[in-house]
Amino acid sequence: PTPTHLNYTLFHPVGVCALISPWNVPFMTSTWKVAPCLAFGNTAVLKMSELSPMSAARLGELALEAGIPPGVLNLVHGYGKEAGEPLVRHKDVRAVSFTGSTLTGNRIVQAAGLKKFSMELGGKSPFVIFDDADFERALDAAVFMIFSNNGERCTAGSRILVQQSIYAKFVDRFVERAKKIRVGDPLDEQTIVGPMISKAHLAKVRHYIELGSKEGASLLCGGLAQPDLPERVKRGNYVLPTVFADVDNRMQIAQDEIFGPVACLIPFKDEAHAIALANDIQYGLSSYVWTESVGRAHRVAAAIEAGMCFVN
């Protein structure tokens, strides 16, 4: 305010929002989109991946049970061309929220026109471990961030950059841990890595494993070998936790988002080298830094070109 004027900003609901969620963590990403959308007074049309429709259907049932009026949260099922694209292009849709692949995200931006939109797209996140890091905690986190959820996560720490002085030790311990990961029935609570989402995606992951060996990276475990599975799931889309060491950051397996349990271990010399490797990528979704130095943590986090940086 001023002596003669009162200025303020007034926020209004935008209207109908198209919310497009992926298959890898379908319930969580749906709730992340739906909750703030409805809380601010908008209505939502939720379109799930055709590969994971059931959790959204259950979310719709729960919404009705909770008393959300009919028509406030709406569900659309189908393929992108038949369901997603018409939704994005519809004249009554005022905003679009999409989580998924970079390729599809580019298409949505083109189709959305002047609508408001938010995107969370692909990633090839650097997981940087300096030689002063808490080794055991960094090892635990590195294993978790690439192999949990089958490696099918956009924030997976798939490029593991390790300082040369601890690189050999880290490789040995990381491979030891990877070999112990239980692969099998997703309904078994002891299972860590379950099946890939589809046969097409399994073929993609296996293609990159073959490519890594052809490019000259050292395959230390996993690969194309078939896991020992219970009879009930033998026909599933399984791939073993796979570790490539001595990866050159220019290799395709280091540059492309594989979206599976495939780790690329890359040595670095010093802080400047680590930052250069971390930023030598087309993606910039997330990053991870492990160090006991507060100053280094702030420097590296600021220098890495990523939307999120998690320290220790």
Residue ranges and their predicted role:
Residues 43-45, 219, 308:
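A short hydrophobic/small-residue beta-strand
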Residues 95, 103-248, 272, 277, ...:
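ALDH superfamily catalytic-core signature
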Residues 1-137, 268:
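Rossmann-like NAD(P) dinucleotide-binding subdomain of oxidoreductase/dehydrogenase enzymes
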Residues 32-34, 208, 296:
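Conserved sugar-transfer catalytic core signal across GT-A, GT-B, and GT-C glycosyltransferases
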Residues 131, 198, 264-269, 290:
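A structural signal for short, well-ordered beta-strand elements
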Residues 261:
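Glycine-rich nucleotide-phosphate-binding loops and adjacent flexible coil segments
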